[in-house]
């Protein structure tokens, strides 16, 4: 066992834990197919959303962790269930009336409502691939339609016929009585309408490779199960795919957890070995409801990247994947600042166990760039933006270079992007919620004391000395809990409930500018 292997496992980082599970399941040996197969899934009923990014980002973290522990080659496939019948029309697409005419049709048989691709399914698949390519994911794309029609699943579909009774015995106890009478693992594609039919199967013939059902006119119809003439119900389809492709690792959301036993059992019935599995919790919107592609009630990845870097969103995905998290715009600043802190800690740390435990190791797959913000944070730049209301980042850079002469937009590109993001976020989310506290007589005394303090320091005064002086003023004012003192100051000076360390803020904004800010609150212009 190598030192890297030992340190990685000791780090207790969840990607390494998952990677070890895969290696253990293989007994450390190369699979017969010659590589370890990681799979992610995509339901193309709606546009790719942040959950799509999350699943792929997390699986790649495990894939890269596995590559640290083993020399066995790996492959990632992204599988699109584009042969599914349309069950409802998403609320966030154009031409919904047109799409509604194609209910129960395979997604790849519905005209593209956007007017750009061969079909609805092709459009969504193209969006997925563009989405994954944008973030540099290395994957192979698999289309359910192509797999069924090209015969990739034919052998397994015949095996489903051979194991029909065993699969039905597994599935039927999971349904209500009325569904038991109509359920069948196969869904024929209607030769007349092209719809995916959920009908009882009257007969099945493993030798002929066919199933029979009655159409809406009561006529017997016999169709082959191969060549794309049928598809499986989604639960048997999941297990069949694992067996057909010999998948070694799959992640899925909590909505699949209750059925995971069925997927695994069907895979075994068909002669396959179920993959190592990981269940992640779903994202919730700001109202605590599950995010949905068809409803479009989530932050898109593009939305996030309008206000922050991709590293911050990757950090959000890394943290506690088995815990449900609310996903709304308020989480962005915190994740940016946490990423900055973790990045700095990583490069100061020499112990490899601690480095392996740091999320940035997995976000960057072991190749962590070193960023320098000179002690400035996203939150601090937001607060600076709040008081100077800049139209562009050059205004912020005037304060930044005064605070740290070494920093320039050209040499500090991360900080330059941070300034741009902060201005955009402030104007879209902070400014509209500003609410200033009315200055009371008690507050006036505090503000006069702050003015006196500012008159006795310079821009060269140490941040800690300024911070201590601010603490002393709060204590003198009689605040038992200084949190309320600072909250009052934030509401008076910034119009918000939270804010920066004043020592750092005053150093960044400047003593004279801060004096002017305080004076504006003491002597408001009528």
Swiss-Prot record:
GO terms for cellular component: cytoplasm
Location in the cell: Cytoplasm
Residues that, per the record, bind ATP: 293
'KMSKS' region (motif): residue ranges: 290-294
UniProt cross-references to Pfam families, sorted A to Z: tRNA-synt_1f
Intrachain disulfide bonds: none
Keywords assigned: Aminoacyl-tRNA synthetase, ATP-binding, Cytoplasm, Ligase, Nucleotide-binding, Protein biosynthesis
Enzyme Commission number(s): 6.1.1.6
Catalytic function, reaction form: tRNA(Lys) + L-lysine + ATP = L-lysyl-tRNA(Lys) + AMP + diphosphate
UniProt keyword Ligase present: yes
GO molecular function, one term: lysine-tRNA ligase activity
PANTHER family registered for this protein in UniProt: LYSINE--TRNA LIGASE
Protein's name according to its UniProt entry: Lysine--tRNA ligase
Species whose genome carries this gene: Rickettsia typhi (strain ATCC VR-144 / Wilmington)
